[in-house]
A protein has these predicted regions:
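Bacterial N-terminal signal peptides
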Residues: 9-18
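Extracellular/lumenal and peripheral-membrane lipid-interaction modules
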Residues: 23-199
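Bacterial N-terminal signal peptides that target proteins for export
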Residues: 1-9
């Protein structure tokens, strides 16, 4: 008997949600998921490298790899290993110096429409070499934040795709508007308004 009432209550909730927009939505994005996004979008080259200057075939080059993210207070810190051969290319050999510093940039998460973005890039640690910093600064302050953008609405739509099989109802996200983003422990917590339809 209890199962019948539970099913009826679930059906009524689904019916009401299908008729009116369901407003409050909270989405949690883990640090690992964000790190995976950065690696897939920026470090998708051979061996997970992103060439800032030159290529794998160049005598002299600068590339970044091994991106690690951590959450510190209300900011995200990206720690990236850099490898560089700086100098002059002579007959296919780089005459100069080799460097392998670790760089860090701190970013503030924010919401814009359906997207989780990152801004206010602050360099925490870069190389001691001015010629390398000339290449690293734009990479850390522009390319890293733009490659970490997450379409929150798309994430939710993918998560809801299997709803018909699991519940018998087709649940779809029609609209999402992000209001705030906060860091809680190892998660990025996104508060948003969303219109969800149940059919």
């Amino acid at each position: 008997m209890t199962t019948k009432w539970g099913t009826l209550a679930l059906g009524l909730v689904a019916l009401l949600c299908g008729m009116t927009p369901c407003q409050a939505v909270e989405l949690k994005v883990s640090r690992e998921a964000l790190q995976r996004t950065l690696r897939q979008q920026l470090f998708s080259g051979p061996d997970g490298r992103y060439f800032i200057k030159g290529s794998a075939k160049s005598a002299c080059w600068v590339y970044a790899d091994d991106a690690q993210l951590s959450f510190t207070q209300d900011r995200i810190v990206a720690r990236i290993k850099t490898h560089a051969r700086l100098g002059q290319s002579v007959h296919g050999t780089c005459l100069g110096i080799s460097l392998a510093p670790t760089s860090e940039v701190s970013l503030e998460p924010y919401g814009e429409g359906e997207t989780i973005g990152f801004r206010d890039a602050q360099m925490i640690k870069v190389s001691d070499r001015r010629e390398l910093n000339f290449l690293l600064a734009p990479f850390l302050s522009r390319q890293v934040p733009s490659s970490m953008k997450v379409d929150a609405a798309e994430l939710m739509r993918k998560a809801l795709e299997g709803s018909t099989v699991s519940s018998g109802y087709k649940v779809t996200l029609d609209k999402l508007k992000i209001h705030s983003i906060q860091i809680h422990g190892d998660d990025l917590v996104v508060d948003a308004d969303g219109d969800i339809s149940v059919k």
